């Protein structure tokens, strides 16, 4: 699909001529607008997300091979009956399992294609891997398992270890089937059960199935020619090959000392791994389409004395405080005090504050835009202060609004470009031209390499079958792929009409905040409540009504109108479907109600009411209602 080039801010009134008083701001909003438009239009390509390649559908399945698993693993097929089958063993699946256990439901199994729990953190073992949300709120169930993170932002090994700690604490290892991929899920009208079949020949029957695949598990590759022709070593960052590079998650990749290394991509993963590669490689070439916004991280060890003062409920208090700030509430204290809360105070706060005095949406968005300009000016100034070469610094400056891409925070990335062995290859928004037998062709020049690393991210809401390598068949054989062919439809972000007892955990149509584990943690309690309620009342199946689903989707789309208009103006990336904004992508937005219409308040009241409003209920007998 062709993507239009945008020539003006559609909903935000930014003057097209220099205005009196712009000198006080330190910048001219009109000139910044023009710069943003030019940078966006430079990068727009037709095709949206289809410009990327699916690793497993494009004949590049070897990029998906698990370097941490036993390649010779085998087991006999299993036939069993469960209350719940959980598909995914990352934090989403772990949280659902933990909440089920707390509800007294233990007859469930967890399936995962990896060889252990951890999800994203099982796969993301690249050097420097680290969470970008305060670890005391990102790592779930800290009080339940009795653990305090070592640093403000935990590194990958600690996060993976914590996932395993949760699994041990709740007795989940005996319930797990690892190195097992779901292939099909079929709903049976006869007995109101799901049949789940796997690549190991398993035949599992369950009353409920939970999709906890997560959003960062299927690597994607750039849609460029020649990937298969490269004669050197290549791998995706989520399948890091330490046998080739040497070292470990802390760096020290001694085997790269005589190697010319290239990395394609400058998103969140590259921000963390580039400094480690810069320390180890003989030569490092960073191929950039669009620079990330990189602000101060300020990581530091956890204060042991502070940890001793924590009282019961401390983690939920911190989670709630972060949630309040990032959803526009006025709070008296910022318990997290990091880059995220600063952004929301400076950029998003004007939107919510002006809503209280009944300003028009247009005026509120104008205030937000000015605040955004100010914040991004400081981010660009930071580049100048840290990068010595003026030309390199100019290429590393992000020219777009703060939330066009997920903001990054790091204290070594920009400085890495001061190393004499590091070269930034700025493709001026076009991306690399091709991969050759010897290296990478970019801007008409071939860069010869020994090793090429793809830091190109994961598939983000592509078609279900493509993203999960599985298919779900609901009532009358309807597939979830077909059901969602025109966009995701849910009720409260988890239930799907036509798919009884099918529960989805994702970031779409829920109150998606920067702390993903907070939202899946909240939803996991909600889903466990529904399962428990069905057991207690003798309910065989629950399914959103078509009306309830339709109304919820409409609310999401309507609330996302301002966000949609902003995303049209962004440089392409996964958050705006590579610039291809349609009604289908509108349905990926969060539910952003405020006040009594906040997502969590709505679901809290829904549970308190106890009537399962919006769901069709099929009971074993009328007496069970």
From Swiss-Prot:
Highest taxon listed in the record's lineage: Eukaryota
Binding site for NADP(+): 130-132, 266-272, 289-290, 405-406
Site feature (Transition state stabilizer) residues: 406
Record's keyword annotation contains NADP: yes
Positions with a binding annotation for FAD: 112, 120-123, 132, 138
Keyword Magnesium: no
UniProt remark on cofactor binding: Binds 1 FAD per subunit.
E.C. number: 1.14.13.-
Cofactor(s) essential for the protein: FAD
One GO MF term attached to the UniProt entry: monooxygenase activity
Stored SUPFAM superfamilies: FAD/NAD(P)-binding domain
Keyword entries, A-Z: FAD, Flavoprotein, Monooxygenase, NADP, Oxidoreductase
Pathway(s) per entry: Mycotoxin biosynthesis
PANTHER family: BLR3857 PROTEIN, L-ORNITHINE N(5)-MONOOXYGENASE-RELATED
Function: Baeyer-Villiger monooxygenase; part of the core atranone cluster (CAC) which products are predicted to catalyze most or all steps of mycotoxin atranone synthesis, starting from geranylgeranyl pyrophosphate (GGPP). The initial cyclization of GGPP to dolabellane is probably performed by the terpene cyclase ATR13. The Baeyer-Villiger oxidation near the end of the atranone synthesis, which converts atranones D and E to atranones F and G is predicted to be catalyzed by the monooxygenase ATR8. Of the CAC's other predicted gene products, the reducing PKS ATR6 might synthesize a polyketide chain.
Family to which this protein belongs: Belongs to the FAD-binding monooxygenase family.
Name of the protein described by the UniProt record: Baeyer-Villiger monooxygenase ATR8
Organism annotation: Stachybotrys chlorohalonatus (strain IBT 40285)
């Amino acid at each position: 699909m062709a993507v239009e080039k945008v020539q003006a801010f559609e909903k935000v009134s930014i003057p097209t001529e220099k205005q009196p008083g712009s000198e006080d701001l330190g910048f001219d909003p009109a000139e910044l607008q023009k710069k943003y438009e030019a940078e966006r239009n430079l990068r727009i390509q037709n095709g949206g997300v289809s410009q990327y390649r699916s690793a497993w559908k494009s004949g590049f399945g070897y990029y998906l091979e698990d370097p941490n698993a036993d390649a010779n693993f085998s087991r006999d097929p299993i036939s069993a009956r469960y209350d719940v089958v959980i598909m995914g063993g990352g934090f989403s699946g772990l949280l659902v399992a933990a909440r089920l256990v707390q509800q007294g439901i233990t007859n469930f199994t967890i399936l995962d294609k990896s060889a252990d729990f951890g999800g994203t953190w099982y796969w993301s073992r690249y050097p420097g891997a680290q969470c970008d949300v305060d670890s005391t709120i990102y790592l779930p169930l800290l009080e339940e398992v009795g653990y305090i993170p070592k640093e403000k932002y935990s590194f990958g090994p600690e996060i993976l270890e914590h996932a395993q700690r949760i699994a041990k604490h709740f007795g989940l290892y005996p319930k797990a089937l690892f190195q097992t991929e779901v292939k099909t899920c079929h709903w049976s009208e006869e007995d109101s059960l799901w049949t789940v079949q796997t690549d190991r020949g398993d035949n599992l029957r369950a009353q409920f199935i939970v999709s906890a695949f997560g959003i960062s598990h299927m690597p994607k590759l750039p849609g460029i020619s020649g990937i298969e022709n490269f004669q050197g070593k290549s791998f995706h960052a989520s399948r890091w090959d330490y046998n080739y590079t040497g070292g470990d998650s802390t760096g020290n990749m001694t085997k790269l000392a005589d190697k010319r290394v290239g990395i394609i991509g400058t998103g969140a993963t590259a921000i963390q791994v580039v400094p480690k590669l810069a320390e180890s490689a003989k030569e490092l070439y960073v191929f950039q389409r669009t620079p990330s916004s990189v602000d101060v991280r300020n990581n530091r060890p956890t204060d042991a004395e502070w940890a001793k003062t924590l009282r019961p409920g401390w983690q939920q208090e911190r989670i709630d405080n972060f949630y309040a700030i990032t959803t526009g509430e006025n709070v008296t204290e910022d318990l997290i005090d990091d880059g995220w809360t600063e952004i929301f105070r400076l950029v998003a706060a004007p939107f919510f504050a002006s809503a209280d005095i009944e300003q028009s949406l247009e005026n509120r968005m104008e205030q937000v835009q000015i605040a955004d300009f100010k914040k991004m000016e400081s981010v660009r100034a930071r580049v100048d202060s840290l990068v010595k070469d003026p030309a390199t610094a100019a290429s590393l400056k992000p020219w777009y609004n703060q939330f066009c891409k997920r903001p990054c925070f790091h204290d070594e990335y920009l400085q890495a470009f001061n190393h004499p062995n590091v070269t930034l290859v700025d493709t001026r928004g076009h991306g690399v031209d091709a991969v050759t037998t010897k290296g990478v062709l970019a801007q008409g020049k071939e860069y010869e390499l020994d090793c090429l690393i793809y830091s190109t991210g994961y598939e983000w809401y592509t078609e279900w079958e493509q993203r999960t390598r599985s298919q779900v068949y609901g009532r009358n054989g309807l597939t979830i792929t077909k059901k969602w062919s025109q966009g995701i439809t849910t009720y409260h972000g988890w239930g799907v009409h036509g798919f009884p007892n099918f529960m989805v955990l994702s970031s779409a149509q829920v109150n998606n905040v920067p702390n993903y584990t907070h939202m899946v943690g909240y939803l996991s309690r909600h889903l466990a409540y529904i399962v428990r309620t069905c057991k207690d009342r003798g309910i065989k199946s629950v399914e959103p009504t078509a009306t309830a689903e339709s109304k919820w989707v409409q609310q999401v789309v309507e609330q996302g109108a301002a966000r949609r208009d902003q995303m049209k103006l962004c440089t392409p990336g996964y958050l705006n479907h590579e610039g291809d904004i349609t009604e289908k992508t509108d349905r990926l937005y969060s539910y952003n109600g405020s006040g009594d219409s906040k997502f969590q308040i709505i679901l809290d009241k829904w549970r308190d009411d106890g009537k399962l409003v919006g769901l069709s209920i099929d009971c074993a007998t009328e007496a069970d209602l």
